[in-house]
Design a protein with these regions (language model features):
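Beta-strand/loop substructures that line and gate deep hydrophobic ligand-binding cavities in soluble
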Residues: 89-117
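Compact, glycine-rich, soluble single-domain proteins
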Residues: 23, 31-37, 42-88, 92
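Terminal, regulation- and interaction-focused segments at domain boundaries
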Residues: 2-38
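Sequence-level motif detector for i,i+2 pairs with an aromatic at +2
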Residues: 11-12, 59-61, 97
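A generic alpha-helix structural signal
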Residues: 27-31, 76, 124, 128-131
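Well-ordered alpha/beta subsegment
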Residues: 112-137
Length: 137
């Protein structure tokens, strides 16, 4: 795996960070980090498992939906359309070469997309640090 690398798909506001862990380890570590921060895991969607149950195959992908109503609610009150993208989400995916990535919408993209007031962007900006910590050794 190696040192965490980052990538940004600026056109769509998607940030990606390469994990130094395997897929399962990355998912578990991320779950532990959000719990330690007092955040709630609202949903864990196993796209690969769902595909398998439908008789299909796909690379490993899991979407983690998490947040805290104390942080998200003021954002949604100020910018109601932000509820389309909140709670926050992180996609953990594994590529054919075994490299594991964590992907998320950049806070700046979400702020621009929904007109989130600058004083509330901090409520969603912590995702970058969480993903960085989950990807690192």
């Amino acid at each position: 795996m190696g040192v965490a690398r980052t990538g940004l798909n600026r056109g769509q506001g998607i940030e990606r960070v390469a994990s130094t862990r395997g897929f399962d380890e990355t998912v578990v570590h991320f779950e532990q980090l959000i719990a330690a921060k007092g955040l709630m895991l609202f949903a864990k969607i196993d796209f690969t498992g769902d595909a398998k149950r439908a008789g299909l195959t796909m690379p490993r992908m899991m979407l983690l939906v998490f947040g805290n109503p104390k942080g998200g609610t003021p954002v949604m009150v100020a910018a109601p359309s932000s509820a389309l993208d909140l709670p926050l989400k992180v996609l953990v995916s594994e590529e054919a070469d075994g490299e594991v990535w964590l992907s998320f919408n950049s806070p700046e993209y979400l702020a621009q997309r929904h007109g989130i007031p600058s004083e509330l962007v901090a409520n969603i900006a912590g995702i970058r640090g969480l993903v960085g910590a989950a990807a690192a050794n």
